[in-house]
Amino acid sequence: MERIKELRNLMSQSRTREILTKTTVDHMAIIKKYTSGRQEKNPSLRMKWMMAMKYPITADKRITEMIPERNEQGQTLWSKMSDAGSDRVMVSPLAVTWWNRNGPMTSTVHYPKIYKTYFEKVERLKHGTFGPVHFRNQVKIRRRVDINPGHADLSAKEAQDVIMEVVFPNEVGARILTSESQLTITKEKKEELQDCKISPLMVAYMLERELVRKTRFLPVAGGTSSVYIEVLHLTQGTCWEQMYTPGGEVRNDDVDQSLIIAARNIVRRAAVSADPLASLLEMCHSTQIGGTRMVDILRQNPTEEQAVDICKAAMGLRISSSFSFGGFTFKRTSGSSVKREEEVLTGNLQTLKIRVHEGYEEFTMVGKRATAILRKATRRLIQLIVSGRDEQSIAEAIIVAMVFSQEDCMIKAVRGDLNFVNRANQRLNPMHQLLRHFQKDAKVLFQNWGIEHIDNVMGMIGVLPDMTPSTEMSMRGVRVSKMGVDEYSSAERVVVSIDRFLRVRDQRGNVLLSPEEVSETQGTEKLTITYSSSMMWEINGPESVLVNTYQWIIRNWETVKIQWSQNPTMLYNKMEFEPFQSLVPKAIRGQYSGFVRTLFQQMRDVLGTFDTTQIIKLLPFAAAPPKQSRMQFSSLTVNVRGSGMRILVRGNSPVFNYNKTTKRLTILGKDAGTLTEDPDEGTSGVESAVLRGFLILGKEDRRYGPALSINELSNLAKGEKANVLIGQGDVVLVMKRKRDSSILTDSQTATKRIRMAIN
């Protein structure tokens, strides 16, 4: 107060006013503030007073020879004064206009290539459709979004190397282009930019736009893919939204969308296999999305989604430190807790062992259609503020928060037994049991929760157990807000560990993700996903499993044949036969397997009964753990097309049909490939022809190593001996001839010799 009086007093004296308004600014601190550093302190003011001058622009001296001194209107374009501090001349803004209208033209061929992202944007906007404007309250939440459509997904460092290599190829400096995408892009751009006259700096800027994902943390209601974000200013305001359909898609959005679908399919499939983690890795490494290896995409793509993050964790990549529960991303914003095991009783007197979080904590919850702020203490919900698109979404968020709070009244609201299982038929953990139970029906939960009178708070409203809004009453601690809750902004990534059941933990041991959190939503991928792993054969149903299994045997017949005769157990345990088991009726799997294995053993023991077609046909059945029984079968059943279909042990059937003349195999009418050798011609044809140049010495001799296939014989040196597997599944010892002259007689004697060696 005293200071203010004093200042008023000073200002009333005319001399003070004069000093303050007339004296020059020569205080060192002020001069320092406006002159130190390269950063302009008041850019708009600087621009205004610069442009008010007659010659605010400097240009190279050569410009005076290229531009007249005055334009058609007689206005001066450049000054005879040179710029202080450089050897450039001062020019008027009118000079720029003259240059743009009358200056030299250059080739424009490179413009669409360099400014590709801009040209494509114009096309998208031209073909996009803008719908009506609606006036309504916009629940926007800040999300990290991709702001530049049409980019590749290189890291900043990778992009920098590519740009240097393309724009300044002769500059020194270590550049290592390693990834597939780096090499492809570099080659492509170098070809595109031959004889390009656009300034290298501009080219570098534009390349960066094309190669690197740029993200911003922006308030969004609605679509978050980059083709919507580029028109954010046109589609949503504070109280209005305009409908818009993009006029084109961009690859980066398609990659994100397809990656999520592939990851979900892979995690779901891995969760039900014997070793989920190993299976998941095997599938990630053998899958391609739009022709790019999935593991390469995972390394570069920052998409945060539960399944994608599980795949990243398995590959040892860092992921976000937030955790997932009930499809919501939780981020603790304050407080802390310790965990303790506690046994609780449900309303049905079932005992559950839950890990209780003791302590006060605050969380933000962000879901696809609803967001919330949650404050909780040990097994008690203090406050939940929810906002969402509709009643259904708000209810989902409330259920998740109530279960997460671990309150007793929630556990007591359970009616009936909790016995939910995951895809692998294992019981879910207690927290997910509770979640599933209430997601099915939350009526009792909401009724038992309790209600309270509420104060009138701006922008907040109560919600009753039947989900109707109210200004007087609300479920205890629960309020609905008009404002959304922002997504967690930090892009920090943390080191995590993953166990064999795909549970992802942070370094303090908190579970961040588990397969239960992976969405069951099915979608159609925008880019082709190629799963090479046999584990994914079943994604397209039983028929695909059947066709793929037999195709695999035929493609690998050479090695399968050797294993069949020498190491059958190893062959039966191959993972490629795993999907097939789901087609065989459970009750009879073991008997089928025992029967087929016995049959195969007889084939090995009784010479000349080797039958390729039959081995291929029955092999997948031998993969199940065998039951010893004396049962004989003339046909084996597989469940496809919604019913049991029969595969005949001897002969063709609609399921498995081998055509001797064309040597083609059809499975359920679909082509499954050609057999390279005819199963029924005995040894005479193939073997005698192939064994030209080899002398048959007699029966198999183990000292010469495992049996080679006929194709592998060509690698032998002259005089070298080896065991070789011939058509009947029999093994004989051969030696490569030292001279070529006697080759002709081989084919005649081979047939006789083979018979002798075998018998």
Swiss-Prot record:
GO terms for molecular function: RNA binding; RNA-directed RNA polymerase activity. It holds the Pfam family Flu_PB2_6th. GO terms for cellular component: host cell mitochondrion; host cell nucleus; virion component. One of its GO terms (biological process) is viral RNA genome replication. The keyword Cell wall biogenesis/degradation does not apply. The record marks K627 as: Mammalian adaptation. It is found in: Virion; Host nucleus; Host mitochondrion. InterPro entries: Flu_PB2_2nd, Flu_PB2_6th, Flu_PB2_C, Flu_PB2_CAP-bd, Flu_PB2_middle, Flu_PB2_N, INV_PB2, PB2_helical. Keywords: Cap snatching, Eukaryotic host gene expression shutoff by virus, Eukaryotic host transcription shutoff by virus, Host gene expression shutoff by virus, Host mitochondrion, Host nucleus, Host-virus interaction, Inhibition of host innate immune response by virus, Inhibition of host MAVS by virus, Inhibition of host RLR pathway by virus, Inhibition of host RNA polymerase II by virus, mRNA capping, mRNA processing, Viral immunoevasion, Viral transcription, Virion. Its main location: virion. A motif (Nuclear localization signal) lies at residues 736-739. Belongs to the influenza viruses PB2 family. Influenza RNA polymerase is composed of three subunits: PB1, PB2 and PA. Interacts (via N-terminus) with PB1 (via C-terminus). Interacts with nucleoprotein NP (via N-terminus). Interacts (via N-terminus) with host MAVS (via N-terminus); this interaction inhibits host innate immune response. Plays an essential role in transcription initiation and cap-stealing mechanism, in which cellular capped pre-mRNAs are used to generate primers for viral transcription. Recognizes and binds the 7-methylguanosine-containing cap of the target pre-RNA which is subsequently cleaved after 10-13 nucleotides by the viral protein PA. Plays a role in the initiation of the viral genome replication and modulates the activity of the ribonucleoprotein (RNP) complex. This is Polymerase basic protein 2. It comes from Influenza A virus (strain A/Leningrad/134/1957 H2N2). The gene is PB2.
